[in-house]
A protein has these predicted regions:
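Membrane-interfacial helix-loop-helix
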Residues: 1-5, 31-108, 112, 119-126, ...
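Transmembrane helix boundary and interhelical junction motifs in multipass membrane proteins
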Residues: 6, 10-28, 105-116
Length: 157
């Protein structure tokens, strides 16, 4: 049940930035002895990935919405969009590197990068895989640091 609630909370936190996944994971880690560190980190990352995929898909499909299309009708904006897509097509490692940095470190904000990735039509599979790996490592680092700190305090106390 703990892992299911973790998944749901992390999906919600990916959709609503006011819900903090890291704080939830720390609270669960401190209060539950049934969920292991890596399981908690992976399930949290899976929930975050699902939520960010919703943002990605919404942004990807937004380019076909009437009011968005009208804003992109100017040659200058279409040229800029084509230029960015071209840059990323020439250097596929660049957007995935920024995405991994965002997923693992949090800068730039992953929500912003998810929207840009969708609008620039980055690979859906590449996006999901990179976010899943980055978030798993981020959450494992936070929970591992917390575990280390609680052990240290127990030895000192």
């Amino acid at each position: 049940m703990t892992l299911l609630l973790t998944f749901a909370t992390c999906v919600l936190s990916a959709l609503v930035p006011l819900v903090n996944a890291e704080a939830y994971l720390v609270a669960v880690s401190l209060t539950s002895s049934t969920a292991g560190l890596w399981a908690l980190a992976f399930v949290g990352a899976l929930g975050q990935t699902v939520g960010k995929l919703i943002w990605y898909e919404a942004a990807r499909r937004s380019l076909s919405w009437g009011w968005v299309r009208r804003r992109l009708e100017t040659p200058q904006r279409q040229e800029a969009l084509a230029r960015w897509r071209g840059r990323f097509a020439e250097r596929p490692w660049l957007p995935m590197s920024v995405l991994f940095l965002s997923a693992s470190v949090g800068l730039p904000p992953l929500l912003v990068i998810a929207v840009l990735a969708g609008q620039l039509h980055l690979s859906r599979v590449g996006f999901a895989f990179t976010v899943l790996v980055g978030r798993t490592l981020r959450f494992a680092a936070i929970l591992g640091g917390l575990d280390w700190l609680t052990e240290l305090l127990a030895r000192l106390g």
